[in-house]
Amino acid sequence: MSIQANLKEVLSELPTGVRLVAVSKFHPNEALEEAYAVGQRIFGESHVQEMTQKYETLPKDIEWHFIGHLQTNKVKYMAPYVAMIHAIDSYKLLVEVNKQASKVHRVIPCLLQIHIAQEETKFGFSFDECREMLDTGGWKDLKNVRLSGVMGMATNVDDDEQIKREFCSLNTFFKEIKQSYFSVS
Protein backbone atom coordinates (compact mmCIF):
# COMPACT_ATOMS: atom_id res chain seq x y z
CA MET A 1 0.00 0.00 0.00
CA SER A 2 1.34 3.44 -0.90
CA ILE A 3 2.02 6.09 1.73
CA GLN A 4 -0.86 8.16 0.38
CA ALA A 5 -3.35 5.26 0.41
CA ASN A 6 -2.26 4.18 3.89
CA LEU A 7 -2.50 7.72 5.23
CA LYS A 8 -5.95 8.26 3.74
CA GLU A 9 -7.15 5.02 5.35
CA VAL A 10 -5.74 5.93 8.78
CA LEU A 11 -7.14 9.46 8.64
CA SER A 12 -10.59 8.16 7.70
CA GLU A 13 -10.66 6.08 10.90
CA LEU A 14 -9.76 8.91 13.29
CA PRO A 15 -12.49 10.59 15.33
CA THR A 16 -13.23 14.26 14.68
CA GLY A 17 -10.76 16.53 16.43
CA VAL A 18 -7.93 13.96 16.57
CA ARG A 19 -4.71 15.04 14.90
CA LEU A 20 -2.24 12.48 13.58
CA VAL A 21 1.48 12.80 14.23
CA ALA A 22 3.09 10.84 11.40
CA VAL A 23 6.35 9.33 12.63
CA SER A 24 8.83 10.26 9.94
CA LYS A 25 12.13 9.35 11.57
CA PHE A 26 14.51 7.51 9.27
CA HIS A 27 12.25 8.20 6.25
CA PRO A 28 13.58 10.22 3.30
CA ASN A 29 12.16 13.62 2.41
CA GLU A 30 10.40 12.07 -0.60
CA ALA A 31 8.24 9.93 1.72
CA LEU A 32 7.27 12.99 3.76
CA GLU A 33 6.49 14.92 0.58
CA GLU A 34 4.15 12.09 -0.48
CA ALA A 35 2.31 12.31 2.85
CA TYR A 36 2.32 16.11 2.64
CA ALA A 37 0.66 15.92 -0.79
CA VAL A 38 -2.44 14.32 0.79
CA GLY A 39 -2.61 16.83 3.62
CA GLN A 40 -0.40 15.47 6.42
CA ARG A 41 1.17 18.44 8.20
CA ILE A 42 2.38 17.04 11.54
CA PHE A 43 5.52 14.92 11.60
CA GLY A 44 7.38 13.36 14.53
CA GLU A 45 11.13 12.91 14.72
CA SER A 46 13.37 11.42 17.40
CA HIS A 47 16.74 12.79 16.30
CA VAL A 48 17.34 16.54 16.46
CA GLN A 49 19.85 16.65 13.61
CA GLU A 50 17.56 14.72 11.23
CA MET A 51 14.55 16.86 12.20
CA THR A 52 16.53 20.07 11.65
CA GLN A 53 17.69 18.94 8.21
CA LYS A 54 14.10 18.12 7.23
CA TYR A 55 12.84 21.42 8.69
CA GLU A 56 15.34 23.32 6.56
CA THR A 57 14.34 21.63 3.29
CA LEU A 58 10.63 20.81 3.56
CA PRO A 59 7.61 23.19 3.49
CA LYS A 60 7.45 25.63 6.39
CA ASP A 61 3.82 24.90 7.27
CA ILE A 62 4.85 21.49 8.65
CA GLU A 63 4.52 21.13 12.44
CA TRP A 64 7.57 19.32 13.81
CA HIS A 65 7.07 17.28 16.97
CA PHE A 66 10.03 15.85 18.84
CA ILE A 67 9.10 12.35 20.02
CA GLY A 68 12.33 10.81 21.31
CA HIS A 69 14.61 11.02 24.30
CA LEU A 70 16.01 14.55 24.32
CA GLN A 71 19.39 15.61 25.66
CA THR A 72 19.57 19.10 27.15
CA ASN A 73 22.48 20.10 24.88
CA LYS A 74 20.32 19.53 21.77
CA VAL A 75 17.36 21.73 22.74
CA LYS A 76 18.90 24.93 21.33
CA TYR A 77 18.89 23.50 17.80
CA MET A 78 15.13 22.87 17.72
CA ALA A 79 13.83 25.70 19.91
CA PRO A 80 13.27 28.09 16.98
CA TYR A 81 10.84 25.78 15.18
CA VAL A 82 9.66 22.72 17.14
CA ALA A 83 5.86 22.68 17.59
CA MET A 84 5.81 20.30 20.56
CA ILE A 85 8.22 18.23 22.62
CA HIS A 86 6.66 14.91 23.60
CA ALA A 87 9.29 13.64 25.99
CA ILE A 88 10.09 15.90 28.95
CA ASP A 89 11.55 13.35 31.34
CA SER A 90 13.19 15.61 33.93
CA TYR A 91 12.80 19.03 35.50
CA LYS A 92 16.33 19.87 34.30
CA LEU A 93 15.20 19.32 30.70
CA LEU A 94 12.06 21.41 31.21
CA VAL A 95 14.20 24.28 32.53
CA GLU A 96 16.52 24.02 29.51
CA VAL A 97 13.60 24.04 27.06
CA ASN A 98 12.28 27.16 28.83
CA LYS A 99 15.70 28.83 28.60
CA GLN A 100 16.14 28.11 24.89
CA ALA A 101 12.53 29.02 24.06
CA SER A 102 12.99 32.34 25.86
CA LYS A 103 15.99 33.14 23.66
CA VAL A 104 13.84 32.84 20.54
CA HIS A 105 10.75 34.46 22.11
CA ARG A 106 8.59 31.34 21.97
CA VAL A 107 6.40 29.25 24.24
CA ILE A 108 6.93 25.56 23.48
CA PRO A 109 4.19 23.08 24.36
CA CYS A 110 5.55 20.01 26.14
CA LEU A 111 4.31 16.63 27.33
CA LEU A 112 5.66 15.13 30.54
CA GLN A 113 6.96 11.63 29.86
CA ILE A 114 5.84 9.17 32.51
CA HIS A 115 7.62 5.83 32.92
CA ILE A 116 4.80 3.26 32.76
CA ALA A 117 6.66 0.32 31.22
CA GLN A 118 8.22 -2.66 32.95
CA GLU A 119 11.43 -1.99 31.00
CA GLU A 120 14.40 -0.07 32.32
CA THR A 121 15.27 1.10 28.80
CA LYS A 122 12.31 3.50 28.76
CA PHE A 123 12.66 7.04 30.07
CA GLY A 124 10.38 9.25 32.12
CA PHE A 125 9.26 10.42 35.53
CA SER A 126 7.83 7.87 37.91
CA PHE A 127 4.39 8.88 39.18
CA ASP A 128 5.96 9.97 42.48
CA GLU A 129 8.78 11.92 40.81
CA CYS A 130 6.27 13.78 38.67
CA ARG A 131 4.07 14.62 41.65
CA GLU A 132 7.15 15.85 43.54
CA MET A 133 8.22 18.04 40.60
CA LEU A 134 4.72 19.50 40.31
CA ASP A 135 4.47 19.97 44.10
CA THR A 136 7.61 22.10 44.23
CA GLY A 137 5.88 24.55 41.88
CA GLY A 138 9.01 25.80 40.13
CA TRP A 139 7.50 24.84 36.78
CA LYS A 140 4.92 27.61 37.23
CA ASP A 141 7.71 30.19 36.85
CA LEU A 142 8.78 28.79 33.46
CA LYS A 143 6.99 31.20 31.12
CA ASN A 144 8.33 29.82 27.83
CA VAL A 145 7.03 26.27 28.16
CA ARG A 146 3.45 25.07 28.41
CA LEU A 147 2.75 21.72 30.02
CA SER A 148 0.14 20.31 27.65
CA GLY A 149 -0.29 16.75 28.88
CA VAL A 150 1.48 13.48 29.55
CA MET A 151 2.79 10.64 27.44
CA GLY A 152 4.09 7.18 28.16
CA MET A 153 5.54 4.21 26.34
CA ALA A 154 4.07 0.84 27.24
CA THR A 155 6.16 -2.28 27.66
CA ASN A 156 7.08 -3.88 24.34
CA VAL A 157 5.14 -7.13 24.80
CA ASP A 158 2.42 -9.10 23.02
CA ASP A 159 0.24 -9.02 26.16
CA ASP A 160 -2.57 -6.61 25.25
CA GLU A 161 -3.91 -6.69 28.81
CA GLN A 162 -0.58 -5.53 30.24
CA ILE A 163 -0.39 -2.72 27.69
CA LYS A 164 -3.97 -1.72 28.51
CA ARG A 165 -3.19 -1.68 32.26
CA GLU A 166 -0.14 0.51 31.70
CA PHE A 167 -2.04 3.05 29.61
CA CYS A 168 -4.99 2.97 32.04
CA SER A 169 -2.58 3.81 34.87
CA LEU A 170 -1.26 6.73 32.80
CA ASN A 171 -4.80 7.95 32.13
CA THR A 172 -5.68 7.74 35.84
CA PHE A 173 -2.50 9.65 36.72
CA PHE A 174 -3.24 12.30 34.09
CA LYS A 175 -6.71 12.86 35.53
CA GLU A 176 -5.21 13.14 39.03
CA ILE A 177 -2.58 15.73 38.14
CA LYS A 178 -4.97 17.64 35.90
CA GLN A 179 -7.34 18.02 38.85
CA SER A 180 -4.60 18.70 41.43
CA TYR A 181 -2.29 21.02 39.49
CA PHE A 182 -4.04 22.34 36.39
CA SER A 183 -7.70 22.81 37.28
CA VAL A 184 -9.09 26.28 36.84
CA SER A 185 -10.80 27.32 40.05
Region spans (language model):
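Conserved alpha/beta-domain cores
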Residues: M1-S185
